[in-house]
UniProtKB/Swiss-Prot annotation:
Protein name: Cytochrome P450 2C27
A single GO cellular-component term on record: endoplasmic reticulum membrane
EC top class named in words: oxidoreductase
Cofactor: heme
Keyword check for Metal-binding: yes
Lineage summary: Eukaryota, Metazoa, Chordata, Craniata, Vertebrata
Gene: CYP2C27
Record keywords, A-Z: Endoplasmic reticulum, Heme, Iron, Membrane, Metal-binding, Microsome, Monooxygenase, Oxidoreductase
Organism, as annotated: Mesocricetus auratus
Role this protein plays: Catalyzes the hydroxylation of tolbutamide and the N-demethylation of aminopyrine and benzphetamine.
PANTHER family: CYTOCHROME P450 2C29-RELATED, CYTOCHROME P450 508A4-RELATED
Main location: endoplasmic reticulum
EC number(s) given by UniProt: 1.14.14.1
Length: 490
């Protein structure tokens, strides 16, 4: 009995200590809902609609508030003004990468997405340089995307106008563009090694967007001891790591320092130059992780946006008709669309922007962290605190985009029908951590969609009013429901 009393006393003390520590921290941080010991505010958040939960909290606590994800606090920025003030006006201080236990487990602080400090700066700077050298923003990259767009059209023709799920084909195209940049070569859509690699990358992104993974990230101790889809990520990462190791080995054996062929070659040259420096961030392990990051960030995100775009065009046939009319007027039927066409196609440009705004692909962005102690809007945020930026609150701001829950390309058109830019358009985030592949993604979306609509009419299997565009998953990423359509050659 005495032992039981002692145990209860110890547990009570730990409980009170946890309450005291959280109370002390909350006195310095922005206000927020009262957390429970150990689990924080987890049960106050709808893991199937995190953005909706953040919006509800912001109505009570304002645009800057604190949530406890497990035992650790995170500061949430809600609305354009708060997000801009942090990520742009105080970009350096908010440029850290916040806690993401599942990614940290496999990336070990390496790569371009989840690294921090000088390591992140060095790898990002190098990656941007290498991509520019390979033609990013130039005609050479555009040629690759146009080539892939024609391959995509040929694959769609093979459906013979029959109902099909576009997921597979729309995944192959952007993945092949990344392959041509990383490995020099594209792959046939029937290449089994390519297909397996692509599926492993895409499956990991889907799992990371699931509600269960939000639980794992908040309570990382579950990762080792609980069954679940997170173990599939481990198997996939091991496969991807092995696949990339073979590719890197092939590049090492055929490397010509005077004639780099692709991203891996540029990295291997940089690695050779840094061999004398024991502190160099350029290692083979970091190369494999960086390449894995480039695939994860540059394939599933673009293919998901393409899938969502076609679904929205099926839902809104009047929009599709206007886009195809503009394609006929500007491009015609006898040449391939090119990036120079975009400035002459304001409605098409507006449609693509509206797709990205409406679907809100990464609702709460990847977590940031402050790189130093900072006073922000009269609140004290300690170094290392995780920062959650609600991109949903910016992309669906009703002042900037009237009726934001309605799909309307007019959100990006002025009264004269010309394309209208918006500072609120930040599907790729903003500031220091803005997506390094934004330019490539914008090029792919324009060229793939215009080439598809130049060559096919889209036919839905159901009436447009019966098409549901509600995302089936709304965690890390918003994923569209499965659907079928017919590509009718024109």
């Amino acid at each position: 009995m005495d032992a039981f009393v002692v145990l209860v006393f110890i547990l009570s003390c730990l409980f009170l200590l946890s309450l005291w520590r959280q109370s002390s921290e909350r006195g310095k941080l922005p206000p927020g809902p009262t957390p429970l010991p150990l689990i924080g505010n987890f049960f106050q958040i709808d893991v199937k609609d995190i953005s909706g939960s953040l919006t509800n909290f912001s109505k009570v606590y304002g645009p800057v508030f604190t949530l406890y994800l497990g035992r650790k606090p995170a500061v949430v920025l809600h609305g354009y003004e708060a997000v801009k003030e942090a990520l742009i006006d105080h970009g350096e201080e908010f440029a850290g990468r916040g806690s993401f236990p599942m990614a940290e487990r496999y990336n070990k602080g390496l790569g371009i997405v989840f690294s921090n400090g000088n390591r992140w700066k060095d790898i990002r700077r190098f990656s941007l340089m290498a991509l520019r050298s390979l033609g990013m923003g130039k005609r050479s990259i555009e040629d690759r995307v146009q080539e892939e767009a024609q391959c995509l059209v040929e694959e769609l023709r093979k459906t013979n106008g029959s109902p099909c799920d576009p997921t597979f084909i729309l995944s192959c195209a952007p993945c092949n563009v990344i392959c041509s940049i990383i490995f020099q070569n594209r792959f046939d859509y029937t290449d089994q090694d390519f297909l397996t690699f692509m599926e492993k990358v895409n499956e990991n992104v889907r799992i990371l967007s699931s509600p269960w993974l939000q639980v794992c990230n908040n309570f990382p101790s579950l990762i080792d001891y609980c069954p679940g889809s997170h173990h599939t990520i481990t198997k996939n990462v091991n496969y991807i790591r092995s696949y990339l190791s073979e590719k890197i080995k092939e590049h090492q054996e055929t490397l010509d320092v005077a004639n780099p062929r692709d991203f891996i070659d540029y990295y291997l040259i940089k690695l050779k130059q840094g061999n004398y420096n024991q502190q160099s961030e350029f290692t083979l392990e970091n190369l494999a992780t960086t390449v894995r990051d480039l695939f994860a960030a540059g394939t599933e995100t673009t293919s998901t946006t393409l899938r969502y775009a076609l679904l929205l065009l099926l839902k809104h046939p009047h929009v599709t008709a206007k886009v195809q009319e503009e394609i006929d007027q500007v491009v015609g039927r006898h040449r391939n669309p090119c990036m120079q066409d975009r400035s002459h196609m304001p409605y098409t440009d507006a449609m693509i922007h509206e797709v990205q705004r409406f679907i809100d692909l990464i609702p709460t962005n990847l977590p940031h962290a402050v790189t130093c102690d900072i006073k922000f809007r009269d609140y004290f945020i300690p170094k290392g605190t995780t920062i959650i930026t609600s991109l949903s609150s910016v992309l669906h701001d009703s002042k900037e985009f009237p009726n934001p829950e309605v799909f309307d390309p007019g959100h990006f058109l002025d009264k004269n029908g010309k394309f209208k830019k918006s500072d609120y358009f930040m599907p790729f985030s903003t500031g220091k951590r803005m997506c390094a592949g934004e330019g490539l993604a914008r090029m792919e979306l324009f060229l793939f969609l215009t080439t598809i609509l130049q060559n096919f009419k889209l036919k839905s299997l159901v009436h447009p009013k019966d098409i549901d565009t509600t995302p089936v998953v709304n965690g890390l990423a918003s994923l569209p429901p499965s659907y079928q359509l017919c590509f009718i050659p024109v």
